[in-house]
Amino acid sequence: MEASAKLTFARLSPRKTRLVVDMVRGKGIQDALTILRFSPQASAKLVSKLLRSAVANAEQKGASDVDRLYVKSISVDGGPVLKRFVPRAMGRASKIRKPTSHITVVLADKQ
C-alpha cells in the first residue's frame, strides 16, 4: 500500500532542499524523522512535517503497521520564483530572487 503527501509553493530553494531530501530517500520512517530532527537545515523541519502528514495519510487509508513504512520516493521540483528589486546606488536596482519548491513524498510498506 502506498500513501503520498505534497507540499507546494514552499519558500525554500529547490537546490538546498534536495540536499536534505537525499538524506532520507529509501529510509524507514523512524530513521528518516530522526535524521531530519538533528539536521540543521531550514528545510528539514518542513520535510519532517510532510513525512508525518504522509504517515497520517497512510493510517487513514488503513495501513496495518506504520513502523513498516519507508520512503519509497521523495522529490523536489522548482516552483515559481518571486522577483523583487532592491534600490542601489546611483539610481540602479538589483534583482532579488525568492525561489519556491514543490516537494512530493510517497511512502510504501516494506515487503
From Swiss-Prot:
Keywords for this protein: Ribonucleoprotein, Ribosomal protein, RNA-binding, rRNA-binding
A single GO BP: translation
Coiled-coil residue spans: none
GO CC terms of this entry: cytosolic large ribosomal subunit
One function term, GO molecular function aspect: rRNA binding
CDD domains for the chain: Ribosomal_L22
InterPro entries linked: Ribosomal_uL22, Ribosomal_uL22_bac/chlpt-type, Ribosomal_uL22_bac/org-type, Ribosomal_uL22_CS, Ribosomal_uL22_sf
Subunit structure, as described in the record: Part of the 50S ribosomal subunit.
Function: This protein binds specifically to 23S rRNA; its binding is stimulated by other ribosomal proteins, e.g. L4, L17, and L20. It is important during the early stages of 50S assembly. It makes multiple contacts with different domains of the 23S rRNA in the assembled 50S subunit and ribosome. The globular domain of the protein is located near the polypeptide exit tunnel on the outside of the subunit, while an extended beta-hairpin is found that lines the wall of the exit tunnel in the center of the 70S ribosome.
NCBIfam families: rplV_bact (TIGR01044)
Sequence similarity: Belongs to the universal ribosomal protein uL22 family.
Protein name listed in UniProt: Large ribosomal subunit protein uL22
Species of origin: Geobacter sulfurreducens (strain ATCC 51573 / DSM 12127 / PCA)
Gene transcribed to yield this protein: rplV
